[in-house]
Amino acid sequence: WLKLYNAGSFFDSQAIPAADWPKLALKAQSFERLVVECHPQLIREDRILPFQRLLGSGTRLELALGLETAHPEVLERLNKGIDREVFQRSAHWIRHHDMDLRVFVLVKPPFLNESEALEWACRSIDFAFDCGANTISLIPTRSGNGALESLATRGEFAPPRPETLESALAYGIQLGRGRVFADTWDLEKLEPNEIRCSSLRARLEHANQEQRIQSLNEGLARG
């Protein structure tokens, strides 16, 4: 598999010109699957279908969309320029055109407390699968872009607790509706203790790889 993440939208002409597509598609044809990011508002037939044709039938195209959260008010406050209906339409278009859908879900976005964070992570997982997602990536929301630090000083943001991320991952996997992964980058921001962080990383990576929740349950039982 090949993942091309460009910290933006692959089909944004300001990010990746269409003139570069033939070379990119040619290189990607040696892979079974190509995963690219796309903003839900940029799901456009005149851009995506030509690239899909360049790839050919031997390489499966998977589009990764950021839902972030299915919480209507929080989604609006995140200023992504989408709502649930826009996301649903984009997801339906992707599945209708025989592409796979990967969805990014934030675990504990701003404006939610810990119990709300777990509830809405699970509800967002349900919503993503209802939209036809094959894969869901759970992203623990972490500071680092300035805006979140500002929200943190006002008490409107804090990173999720490790057990919230583990519980959300366990919920998604046990549904059996598709693959669910937890992002393990920068875990020390969730768990600064080196020994506990190493154990957390091992449990998450095992669950990611095996798509089983036994290791997560053991970790949650130990607290």
PLM region descriptions:
Residues 129, 141-223:
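Auxiliary Fe-S-binding modules of radical SAM enzymes
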Residues 35, 72-80, 107-115, 154-156:
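Surface-exposed cleft-lining segments at the edges of enzyme active sites
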Residues 15-24, 83-87, 117-125, 158-171, ...:
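Well-ordered, non-membrane alpha-helical segments in soluble/globular domains
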Residues 85-147, 166-184:
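Conserved C-terminal portion of the radical SAM core fold
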Residues 1-16, 27-44, 60-87, 137:
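Core AdoMet radical
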Residues 14-22, 44-55, 115:
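Distinct, well-ordered alpha-helical segments
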Residues 1, 29-33, 56-60, 98-100, ...:
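A general structural motif
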Residues 8-10, 40-42, 69-71, 107-111, ...:
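Active-site-proximal loop/turn and secondary-structure-junction residues that shape catalytic pockets
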